[in-house]
């Protein structure tokens, strides 16, 4: 797989709402992903995209606070984080998998029952191969969202 895109992200009828933006300790999982200490802060941003009042997908961005401050990351008011130009990025690594939605994500997407989702993940790497940002798009199973996979 060479990449993937989400054509509706740029559609004019698509509405975006920032659900949360918080600084919090990295914890064990993100400390390992970003090669930082467990107590170092990370910036977590969640945005919901919908059409006609119906939630389509949830987009997440996670990056270390020191990285966001140093690079002055420009978070777009409209459009996808997927096209976010991050300074210092040497390469990216992408993956596509089926995951179970967390309770918080189910609530944001206004889903009442547990459901799987397609998870598109992109890691942004610096010149030394360290992860400097992590983006995820969660598309719920049974949704009307379209995805194009390039080979």
Predicted regions mapped to residue ranges:
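A short beta-strand signature
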Residues: 39-52, 118-125
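HTH-adjacent hinge/linker in prokaryotic transcriptional regulators
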Residues: 1-41, 66-90, 145-151
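Short, structured loop/turn "capping" segments at alpha-beta junctions
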Residues: 55-56, 89-91
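Solvent-exposed residues in well-ordered beta-strands and their adjoining turns
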Residues: 24, 50, 62-64, 99, ...
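Extended hydrophobic
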Residues: 92, 97-127, 131-138
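A short glycine-rich, His/Asp/Glu-containing loop-to-beta-strand
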Residues: 14-17, 44-46, 51, 55-61, ...
